[in-house]
């Protein structure tokens, strides 16, 4: 079973590509939380586990991470784009 890790920095509009953002700027959102990301992952159809004590290596403050389980059929970039779209929809 494949496990993908999604750090909030991957979807953060305040981060540059060098700082860790992995989606296009128009898909990125301002300061996404692990709760929003986990909710979006579940809406996409995968299981999500929140690990709040983890810190992205390029950041100082711990924001946590989301571990996605069972995403064998999707590439990581496709998964990130779908999650970013759902996080945007959740905020509206």
UniProtKB/Swiss-Prot annotation:
Protein family per UniProt: Belongs to the SRP19 family.
Function statement: Involved in targeting and insertion of nascent membrane proteins into the cytoplasmic membrane. Binds directly to 7S RNA and mediates binding of the 54 kDa subunit of the SRP.
Subunit and interaction comment: Part of the signal recognition particle protein translocation system, which is composed of SRP and FtsY. Archaeal SRP consists of a 7S RNA molecule of 300 nucleotides and two protein subunits: SRP54 and SRP19.
Keywords: Cytoplasm, Ribonucleoprotein, RNA-binding, Signal recognition particle
Disulfide bonds listed in the record: none
Any one cellular-component term (Gene Ontology): signal recognition particle
UniProt subcellular location: Cytoplasm
Protein name: Signal recognition particle 19 kDa protein
GO molecular function terms listed in the Swiss-Prot or TrEMBL record: 7S RNA binding
Sections of the chain in a coiled coil: none
Domain of life: Archaea
HAMAP family the UniProt entry points to: SRP19
SUPFAM superfamilies according to UniProt: SRP19
One Pfam family here: SRP19
BP GO annotations: SRP-dependent cotranslational protein targeting to membrane, signal sequence recognition
């Amino acid at each position: 079973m494949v496990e993908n890790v999604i750090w909030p920095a991957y979807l953060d509009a305040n981060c540059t590509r060098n700082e860790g953002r992995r989606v296009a700027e128009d898909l990125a959102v301002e300061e996404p939380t692990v709760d929003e990301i986990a909710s979006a992952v579940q809406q996409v159809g995968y299981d999500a586990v929140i690990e709040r004590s983890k810190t992205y290596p390029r950041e100082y403050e711990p924001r946590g991470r989301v571990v996605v389980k069972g995403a064998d059929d999707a590439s990581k970039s496709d998964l990130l784009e779908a999650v970013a779209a759902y996080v945007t929809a959740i905020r509206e």
